Amino acid sequence: MKILVDENMPYARDLFSRLGEVTAVPGRPIPVAQLADADALMVRSVTKVNESLLAGKPIKFVGTATAGTDHVDEAWLKQAGIGFSAAPGCNAIAVVEYVFSSLLMLAERDGFSLHERTVGIVGVGNVGRRLQARLEALGIKTLLCDPPRADRGDEGDFRSLDELVQHADILTFHTPLFKDGPYKTLHLADEKLIRSLKPGAILINACRGAVVDNTALLTCLSEGQKLSVVLDVWEGEPELNVELLKKVDIGTPHIAGYTLEGKARGTTQVFEAYSKFIGHEQHVALDTLLPAPEFGRITLHGPLDQPTLKRLVHLVYDVRRDDAPLRKVAGIPGEFDKLRKNYLERREWSSLYVICDDASAASLLCKLGFNAVHHPAR
């Protein structure tokens, strides 16, 4: 059995070798010749999986180690009798922590408290729900918009997008990309929406590039609209609008979900799905794969305020480390993908063991996802 895996899927070679012969290949572009005798294909979001790629090939199963699936023609796979699995929620924690890293940087730079801001969350799936929970643990007001879930009667106080635009100081997008249909998200943030944002608002897109109309956004910023922007995703990736990058406050190369834990979850989820597909079901404990974190433990004295939280968050991950490299190479062919391929190891907050002498600080840090314990001072 021959299994092709994206060369940037951590632990894929070791795991899938339990099931067959493994060949690691680049994800963009996939070397088509390798598909001629392969039984399974494991990809990431950079690989477009459709009829033109797989028609006439012996592939029986496709797995994507990503939460999103808009790069996969699921309808055609089903029609062709090809098994499929994604990894929903695998990188949700990573994306939430990316948003926090960005907001805490902007708050420090611009001198505001997040408690003074209302956060509008557009898309309340795996990422949106986790973001809401962590923000509300800090006492930060959130407004939720998710028409599909609202129409299904899902639990939640869902508002219209217009209401979020009117009342939110921070608007962050966490939707799939739907190019048509009743819940279309292509250019959901169009020129009208962008111009309607509150003066000084913060706009964040860490889902799919085309959810925000990049041309309209550049127009508004070029005309001097007072708006802070965080973009991790771009229309036309791996190409991006260099002029837009110059205007945004934080720009990164589609790496919001790129924690080691998130990647490992994605790999293990599709590995477990494929093992079940072929009748040799196996399960993997994530902590058996991950290395020891860079920082073993730290001690925190006193209560948890915003500056202290910012220091802890940026000790684990400071978004500026990914902004600067992109600005240096933007516009050079191939460099966007190279930044992603050679991405520095990044961990999640849970990797940081925090010893607190303040019980409320320990409790709050645990709610936020840190590995915190209370040890009273002696």
UniProtKB/Swiss-Prot annotation:
Record-stated family: Belongs to the D-isomer specific 2-hydroxyacid dehydrogenase family. PdxB subfamily.
Record carries keyword Lyase: no
Swiss-Prot/TrEMBL keywords: Cytoplasm, NAD, Oxidoreductase, Pyridoxine biosynthesis
Assembly information from the UniProt record: Homodimer.
This protein's record includes keyword Oxidoreductase: yes
Pathway note: Cofactor biosynthesis; pyridoxine 5'-phosphate biosynthesis; pyridoxine 5'-phosphate from D-erythrose 4-phosphate: step 2/5
Alphabetical list of PROSITE patterns matching this protein: D_2_HYDROXYACID_DH_1 (PS00065), D_2_HYDROXYACID_DH_3 (PS00671)
Amino-acid positions noted as binding NAD(+) in the UniProt annotation, renumbered to this chain: 146, 175, 232, 257
EC number: 1.1.1.290
Residues of the active site: 208, 237, 254
Protein name as annotated: Erythronate-4-phosphate dehydrogenase
SUPFAM superfamilies: Formate/glycerate dehydrogenase catalytic domain-like, NAD(P)-binding Rossmann-fold domains
Positions with a binding annotation for substrate: 45, 66, 258
Catalytic reaction(s) noted: 4-phospho-D-erythronate + NAD(+) = (R)-3-hydroxy-2-oxo-4-phosphooxybutanoate + NADH + H(+)
The protein's role, per its UniProt record: Catalyzes the oxidation of erythronate-4-phosphate to 3-hydroxy-2-oxo-4-phosphonooxybutanoate.
GO molecular function: 4-phosphoerythronate dehydrogenase activity; NAD binding; protein dimerization activity
GO cellular component: a single term: cytosol
One GO biological process term: pyridoxine biosynthetic process
Localization: Cytoplasm
Cited InterPro entries: D-isomer_2_OHA_DH_cat_dom (IPR006139), D-isomer_DH_CS (IPR029753), D-isomer_DH_CS1 (IPR029752), D-isomer_DH_NAD-bd (IPR006140), Erythronate-4-P_DHase (IPR020921), Erythronate-4-P_DHase_dimer (IPR024531), NAD(P)-bd_dom_sf (IPR036291), PdxB_dimer_sf (IPR038251)
